[in-house]
Amino acid sequence: MNAPIRSDQLSAMTAAPTLPAFVHLRVRSAYSLLQGALPIPQLAKLAVANRFAAIALTDQNNLFGALEFSNKLADAGVQPIAGLTLTVDFRDTLEDPAHANLKGADAKTVISGDIALLAMSEEGYANLMKLGTEVFFDPALNEAPHIAVDRLEQHSAGLIALTGGADGPIARALIEDRRAVAEARLDRLVEIFPDRLYVEIQRHRMREERETEAALIQLAYAKDMPLVATNDCHFATPSDYEAHDALMCIAGGNYVVEDDRRQLSPEHCLKSADEMLALFADLPEAIANTVEIARRCHYRPLGRAPILPRFVSTGDGASAKDQLKAEAEELARQAREGLKARLEAHG
């Protein structure tokens, strides 16, 4: 398995002319209901126009678009990376008195935060499907979809994890001035994803990102964890921001003129590789690790013909033609019996 890239490995990687400079690992399509505004056909066209070698789809709590994404991007000559953004509950929201004092009666409703998972292999994609289902089973009544960290551990094989941006569990704990909890959460993720965990850095010009970035980098370096640069893409271009903001208001039941509501920024768009290189010029290893992650993800979901049940047993040695003939005869028999029963009942 390839190890995460460190600063001292950068020169060898950047010298290879065949490697892309940057890979988007956090993209939400229109299948992120009331969050994303990128139809997958448009995403495929944008990937080609921007000459992306690979791109990941990480919709919120679902894989609705995974197969369409895989087929469209592969047909366009772009490597599709199957992923998922999951809300994870570390079950620690009441263990720290500082958090209870901060949130009061609302402490129980605070879920730890979002992480991104990327499928490295067929086993990893199978685990993504399990997690995408169970995320709706763990929550209690009236709670938002999320998954317990112990459940995440049960289905972690074959997956790469990114720690999330300002909405991630590590950054959220730092925003609440709970550094010990942030460290404990990071340590727990390291246990679950050894050699497959990256500390995520995002720069959308959001206050929460500015307040937590230095601490996140410090934590990563202190624990010898690799960094990765991402842009949480919700829409295509900055000009789409206002329309997307209205979409978020619909999702939250708010008005655009309200200030006290969840808002993104025009920076949550699908930026070019050059824009990302300029944005993270001071953290080249975080950019290089996007390419390394793409290289570690070598599986994509494939379509298959419908698998229909067999209505008649013809034995192990029967040919497909014999099976079809037997099923046709069985259908005719049941139709005749049904017709006879109706005629007898109604005269």
Tell me the role of every PLM-derived stretch.
Residues M1-G347:
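Phosphodiester-processing cores and adjacent nucleic acid-binding clamps
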